[in-house]
Amino acid sequence: MAHEPIPFSFLRNLLAELDASEHEVLRFLCRDVAPASKTAEDALRALQRRRLLTLSSMAELLCALRRFDVLKVRFGMTRECAGRLLGHGFLSQYRLQVAAINNMVGSEDLRVMCLCAGKLLPPSCTPRCLVDLVSALEDAGAISPQDVSVLVTLLHAVCRYDLSVALSAVAHGHMTVGVGTPVQDEPMDVLEVDDAEPMEATPACDEIGVVKLAGAASAGAPLADGAFAACTSAGKGEDLATSDLTDSEPEDSVFAVADPVYADVDLSMFVRANATADSSMFVNADAGADSSLVNADAGADSSLVNADAGADSSLVNAVADANSSLMRTTSACTDSEPEDSAGPSCAGMALSMFGRAKSVSSLLLRTKASY
């Protein structure tokens, strides 16, 4: 029953279920038996006249098209059952291979292959798939089942070496293509990375104030600007210095200062004033026209005096107290110190002159006693 001819009326309904590309593949598969056929219907008619259109050959054609659904609906045959009928038809391994790689070549690759073929193709030839291109090259005599060198070259032009190798092996009889089994792409070489050797760790500097000392001679070597840093060894003998930065330091400061550093201040801007027995007065006179404001907080028994010294001096702050004694002080102030730092205490300073002060630290001048 597998070798009995199939009525053509039955095949017309079968062809209606195939699309245009499958018609082209079906016609290409029958070219060895019906080379002059122009359509799939003509190819099947030629097979029927030669009594080659049997159930086994039809199962082989549908398996090559991978239409197992049609095979089951029209013939009631499963894929496993159809596999037992294969290998007894008229299909060559070369045509089965080309049909298998037909869907693996995209439209862009097909366009490049047509351009590379050049004058081998007729001017009016516009292939829509790979089997159309192969059929046109066969008509031109450039390709045959025994000579596929031109097709291999075209596949190399689009870097499809996997398809060209499989096609060459089939053409030379070194490989057999199973019907309905497309050629799988060869796996690409994977670069293996040896993870046994750990990567070299890089010392991380996550905290602010950790700097790399490129030219440090030793761990205890003094740094520039009188700053001191603690040097530790990390990584490959690299020296790291950690500095204790505070919020009171300016942002451009890198190294912390161990002790307060007092810059040389021109003391000519301060005037030593002598107070009488009845009152004591501190006078800070600035020689420039633009001087700063000095605010003194006075209690109930003290008087606040803000006097303008004129064009050459800015403000005079005097705190008077009838019971205060004479006191002379010389101060040196640095503007670089923070306001919340009182600095060294002034020796021998009597605070009774300030009366009931709300905050002593707010009234003290930022001074350093000179001895």
Curated annotation (Swiss-Prot):
Please report the stretch or stretches of sequence annotated as the DED domain: 6-76, 93-169
A biological-process GO annotation: symbiont-mediated suppression of host NF-kappaB cascade
Q: Which SUPFAM superfamilies match?
A: DEATH domain (SSF47986)
SMART domains associated with the record: DED
| Keywords tagged on the record | Host-virus interaction, Inhibition of host NF-kappa-B by virus
Q: Which domain of life is it from?
A: Viruses
Which Gene3D superfamilies does the entry link to? Death Domain, Fas
Query: Matching InterPro entries, A to Z?
Result: DEATH-like_dom_sf, DED_dom
Asked if the record carries the keyword Metal-binding, the reply is no
**What is the protein's quaternary organization?**
Interacts (via C-terminus) with host HSP90AA1. Interacts (via N-terminus) with host CASP8. Interacts with host FADD.
Role, per record = Plays a role in inhibition of host innate immune response. Reduces TNF-alpha-mediated NF-kappa-B activation. Interferes with IKK kinase activity and reduces the phosphorylation of both components CHUK/IKKA and IKBKB/IKKB.
What is this protein's name?
Answer: Protein MC160
Q: Which organism is it from?
A: Molluscum contagiosum virus subtype 1 (MOCV)
Species lineage:
Viruses, Varidnaviria, Bamfordvirae, Nucleocytoviricota, Pokkesviricetes
Gene from which the chain derives = MC160
